[in-house]
């Protein structure tokens, strides 16, 4: 629509909620797909092709104009058309340029009049450095957790009241009453025994023991016996000569010991069932972090490893501020020196981490020394440290919601391609994140080994081994000449398998694809099928006709299956294949492995169990919303992770999801169960021997 009369009446507030990326999701269903912001108030909701929450808001409030947050379209509900014109003050143009600057984190663009809309996300690395905004959301996280706990407590109270009225509930109450009465009787009997024992002890202490005349005669001291001097008594009771006495066994001492012992609190929430706040189109990051935190081996490694102190020491050594004595050779370790001020370093790190986010900020101190460390000269960004801190919070059982400020801050610094609030691909983010974590572990473990204690070096090596091998598998690329039957084998590593859809699901324009669901086993069979090599791709002196086949020759501990739902349509457009892929809770990989591997491995090593699923909601590559299904081992149930909203679900619901990335965990691992060494491997299949 060229001209909409309702735009002329628009008066856009300068502090509109749309300027805060944390509000870029539907307030009702929490999706980030097709989100529309009302231009008359602060309401943000999803479009009519999702749940129609924005349309319902118009029907209730009669606010006609709304702006699509990601595509920046303006729609008028009264005119029932898209709006192309602007008001006299140019508010829509200014709003679009401001939102574009917020997405790209580029604030250099200004209007001709110099007028601008200020966002909560100000310059230099965003709102993460803004202590006020961070403290505000931390308080919101606490309030959300407290509200969640109160709701569950009230729900439990109502359920217990109802259950007490049922026949089974009455039976349970009667059993509990009898159990309490028996426990009370045992407690009374125990108190009587203690009282009798105490009374008996007092009587024995007040009554002098009876002795025979012979013993009394022997006890009398002779005239020559010398009493110990005061000096000898002091020497006997000194700490160097004083012997250990057994711990008191009286009831009073026992009760004191029990009272001082720490009591393990029952967790507020199930460990791992912690939501991650959407900080502005960060659903791709939240879904991947939930997946990684629910992988048991990966999580346990980063819960034990914290590279914060290690990187501070390495940074000090690299800048020449660490003083090393000449008595320590280059390969020596310094455990005593590094452990001398561990408590001071930890307290400083905790203090800075609390005030400046999970990864902290910067300091101007330039006097950091290894022997007597002061505040670090700068707070170094570490993805490993952020994973360690975030996993600790998520699996503490104390928080129902956490805002991953510092994790996003570290991603922006170390992976610039993901800087800003534009919508990103979860598969690309997972690959980049694992690559950066691997590089960080390799760099930290090899720089200045003398500064790192032996235990820390071993732990870094173990975690690096897990990161390298947990998703690592090997493919056998076998090229067979159809004339001379020569086979050329090449071993290729892989960290995930990208599976293409069969040809019947690739359609153009308005054609409709087959409505029959695709099978995951069919996609795996297509991946490992034999393909003919045409032309002179395979250079042989005698013949050129050949065929190629990919087969798995080494299975990873965690199998990542990436379903290639997005394909190019035209030059600059990528469309989504929205067909449902049918997958099972158990996957047998034996049909897709080479025969030599089948002969060496146990049958259980081919069996994989479904552990996590990443879903993409939406129709396009550059838009949509990511959620994840994760199996929680602490509670023994599946959890649907939709940013801050988490709820339990059944495995049947998981298998009905429109999967984008599937994670399968190997049921039985066998490190040496592959035959890649027994296969004839050639560096290049294009030049086989005669």
UniProtKB/Swiss-Prot annotation:
InterPro entries: Papain-like_cys_pep_sf (IPR038765), Peptidase_C19_UCH (IPR001394), Ub_carboxyl-term_hydrolase (IPR050185), USP_CS (IPR018200), USP_dom (IPR028889), Znf_RING/FYVE/PHD (IPR013083), Znf_UBP (IPR001607). It catalyses: Thiol-dependent hydrolysis of ester, thioester, amide, peptide and isopeptide bonds formed by the C-terminal Gly of ubiquitin (a 76-residue protein attached to proteins as an intracellular targeting signal). Zn(2+) 2 binds at residues 26, 29, 46, 53. PANTHER family: UBIQUITIN CARBOXYL-TERMINAL HYDROLASE, UBIQUITIN CARBOXYL-TERMINAL HYDROLASE 44. Keywords: Cell cycle, Cell division, Hydrolase, Metal-binding, Mitosis, Nucleus, Protease, Thiol protease, Ubl conjugation pathway, Zinc, Zinc-finger. One of its GO terms (molecular function) is zinc ion binding. Residues 206-223, 231-248 have a biased composition (Polar residues). The gene is usp44-a. The active site is at 283 (nucleophile), 625 (proton acceptor). Deubiquitinase that plays a key role in the spindle checkpoint by preventing premature anaphase onset. Acts by specifically mediating deubiquitination of cdc20, a negative regulator of the anaphase promoting complex/cyclosome (APC/C). A zinc finger (UBP-type) spans 2-99. Its main location: nucleus. Belongs to the peptidase C19 family. USP44 subfamily. Coiled coil: none annotated. It is found in: Nucleus. Pfam families: UCH, zf-UBP. This is Ubiquitin carboxyl-terminal hydrolase 44-A.
């Amino acid at each position: 629509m060229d001209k909409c009369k309702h735009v002329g009446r628009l008066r856009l507030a300068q502090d509109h909620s749309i300027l805060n990326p944390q509000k870029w999701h539907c307030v009702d269903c929490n999706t980030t797909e097709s989100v529309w912001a009302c231009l008359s108030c602060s309401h943000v909701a999803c479009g009519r092709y999702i749940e129609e929450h924005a349309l319902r808001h118009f029907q209730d409030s009669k606010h006609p104009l709304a702006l699509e947050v990601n595509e920046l379209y303006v729609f008028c509900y009264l005119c029932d058309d898209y709006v192309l014109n602007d008001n006299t003050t140019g508010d829509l143009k200014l709003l679009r340029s401001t939102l574009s600057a917020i997405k790209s984190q580029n604030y250099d663009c200004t209007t001709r009049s110099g007028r601008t809309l200020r966002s909560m996300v100000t310059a230099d690395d965003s709102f993460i450095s803004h202590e006020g905004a961070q403290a505000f959301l931390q308080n919101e996280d606490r309030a959300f957790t407290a509200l969640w706990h109160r709701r569950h407590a009230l729900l439990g109270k109502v359920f217990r009241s109802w259950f007490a009225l049922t026949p089974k509930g009455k039976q349970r109450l009667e059993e509990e009453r009898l159990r309490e009465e028996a426990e009370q009787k045992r407690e009374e009997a125990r108190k009587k025994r203690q009282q009798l024992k105490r009374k008996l002890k007092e009587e024995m202490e007040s009554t002098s023991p009876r002795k025979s005349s012979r013993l009394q005669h022997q006890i009398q001291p002779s005239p020559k016996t010398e009493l110990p001097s005061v000096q000898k008594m002091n020497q006997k009771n000194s700490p160097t000569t004083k012997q250990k006495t057994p711990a008191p066994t009286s009831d009073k001492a026992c009760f004191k010991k029990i009272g001082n012992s720490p009591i393990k609190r029952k967790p507020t929430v199930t460990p791992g069932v912690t939501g991650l706040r959407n900080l502005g189109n960060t659903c791709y990051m939240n879904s991947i972090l939930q997946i990684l935190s629910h992988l048991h081996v990966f999580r346990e490694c980063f819960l034990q490893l914290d590279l914060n102190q290690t990187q501070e020491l390495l940074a000090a050594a690299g800048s020449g501020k660490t003083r090393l004595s000449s008595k320590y050779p280059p390969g020596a370790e310094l455990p005593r020196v590094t452990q001398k001020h561990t408590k001071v370093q930890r307290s400083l790190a905790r203090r800075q981490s609390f005030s400046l986010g999970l990864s902290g900020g910067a300091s101007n101190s330039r006097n950091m020394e290894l022997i007597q460390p002061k505040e670090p000269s700068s707070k170094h960004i570490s993805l490993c440290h952020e994973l360690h801190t975030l996993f600790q919070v998520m699996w503490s059982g104390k928080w129902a919601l956490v805002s991953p400020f510092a994790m996003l801050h570290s991603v922006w610094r170390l992976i610039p391609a993901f800087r800003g609030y534009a919508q990103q691909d979860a598969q690309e983010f997972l690959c980049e994140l694992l690559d950066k974590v691997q590089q960080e572990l390799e760099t930290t473990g090899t720089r200045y080994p003398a500064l790192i204690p032996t235990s820390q070096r071993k732990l870094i090596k173990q975690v690096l081994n897990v990161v390298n091998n947990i998703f690592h598998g090997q493919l056998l690329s076998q090229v067979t000449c159809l004339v001379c039957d020569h086979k050329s084998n090449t071993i290729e590593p892989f960290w995930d398998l990208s599976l293409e859809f069969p040809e019947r699901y690739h359609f153009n324009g308005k054609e409709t694809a087959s409505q029959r669901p695709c099978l995951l086993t069919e996609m795996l069979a297509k991946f490992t099928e034999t393909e003919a090599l045409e032309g002179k791709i395979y250079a042989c002196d005698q013949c050129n006709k050949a065929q190629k086949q990919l087969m798995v020759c080494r299975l990873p501990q965690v199998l990542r299956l990436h379903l290639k739902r997005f394909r190019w349509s035209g030059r600059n457009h990528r469309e989504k294949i929205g067909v449902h892929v049918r997958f099972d809770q158990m996957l047998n990989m034996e049909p897709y492995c080479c025969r030599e591997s089948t002969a060496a491995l146990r049958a259980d090593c081919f069996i994989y169990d479904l552990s996590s699923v990443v879903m993409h909601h939406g129709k396009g590559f550059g838009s949509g919303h990511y959620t994840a299904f994760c199996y929680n081992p602490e509670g023994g149930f599946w959890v649907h992770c939709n940013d801050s909203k988490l709820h339990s679900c059944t495995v049947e619901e998981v298998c009905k999801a429109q999967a984008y990335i599937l994670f399968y965990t190997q049921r039985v691992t066998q490190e040496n169960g592959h035959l890649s060494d027994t296969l004839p491997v050639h560096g290049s299949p294009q030049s086989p021997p005669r």
